[in-house]
From Swiss-Prot:
Tissues in which the protein is found: Expressed by the venom gland.
Protein name: Beta-toxin Ct7
Residues annotated as signal peptide: 1-18
The keyword Signal is annotated on this UniProt entry: yes
UniProt key word Signal: yes
Length: 83
């Protein structure tokens, strides 16, 4: 019983840090998509995300549950198109 409590306490204290966002290609642009989630889900899972889908309004892949070390697109630090 003590071991179970120790494991639960450890998980709660350590926590699993995850983030959501738009993954970027090598040029710093969002990964484009048009319809369907299969492509984006595959791209996101290659980055160790829990899932991904095509956000149709933005025509870009959106990943959920990305590790903290994966860079995601941010309008403040946008480098896409030489900006």
């Amino acid at each position: 019983m003590k071991v179970l409590i120790l494991i639960i306490a450890s998980v709660l204290l350590i926590g699993v840090e995850c983030k959501d966002g738009y993954p970027m290609n090598s040029e710093g642009c969002k990964i484009s998509c048009v319809i369907g989630n299969t492509f984006c889900d595959t791209e996101c899972k290659m980055l160790k995300a829990s899932s991904g889908y095509c956000w149709t309004l933005g025509l870009a892949c959106y990943c959920e549950g990305l590790p903290e070390n994966v860079e995601v697109w941010d309008s403040a630090t946008n480098k896409c198109g030489g900006k």
